[in-house]
């Protein structure tokens, strides 16, 4: 992870193109340089796969932007203040909902995510990618139980979308989204 000095230099010299998704991609690529995901690949490749899932679900630009930034507070050394200089409030607030408070338990973390529709959508994509990494025909016990955990968490998050009335335009949209998440 970069030092605060490195991040401040990046922020001072960054020239935004005005494309929110491109800016988020640049931030994520910088923040996660040298970091690895759960499978030993670059963390940015995980970020890109999450974004690809969101693009496949035809999510809007703000959701795609949040997808790029979803690990930046926890693993990238950036702060909420850093994000607020470059991104609209709805984006950085969702990223804050996705960040872990190291003192809270997993249930409190998920309750925090459930307060934000964009955070829920991005977390479902994040967990779907994490689950895909361990999908194989002969999982170890640890992989099996991780899959069970990811499936349970995806189900919980998908159920949480129901409280956002604008989430789906029809019952069919909701059931189709749930099927894609399985």
For each feature predicted by the language model, list its residue ranges.
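Active-site helical microenvironments for divalent-metal-assisted chemistry
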Residues: 1-182
């Amino acid at each position: 992870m970069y030092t605060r000095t490195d991040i401040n230099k990046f922020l001072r010299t960054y020239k935004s193109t005005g494309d929110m998704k491109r800016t988020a991609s640049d931030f994520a690529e910088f923040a996660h340089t040298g970091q690895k995901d759960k499978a030993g690949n670059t963390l940015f490749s995980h970020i890109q796969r999450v974004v690809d899932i969101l693009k496949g679900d035809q999510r809007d630009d703000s959701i795609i932007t949040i997808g790029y930034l979803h690990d930046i507070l926890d693993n990238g050394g950036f702060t909420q203040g850093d994000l607020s200089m470059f991104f609209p409030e709805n984006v950085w607030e969702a990223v804050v909902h996705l960040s872990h408070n190291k003192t809270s338990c997993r249930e409190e973390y998920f309750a925090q995510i459930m307060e934000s529709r964009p955070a829920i959508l991005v977390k479902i994509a994040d967990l779907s990618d994490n689950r895909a990494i361990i999908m194989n025909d002969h999982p170890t016990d640890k992989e099996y139980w991780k899959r069970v955990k990811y499936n349970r968490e995806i189900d919980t998050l998908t159920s949480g979308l129901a409280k956002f009335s604008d989430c789906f335009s029809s019952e069919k949209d909701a059931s189709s989204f749930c099927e894609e998440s399985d």
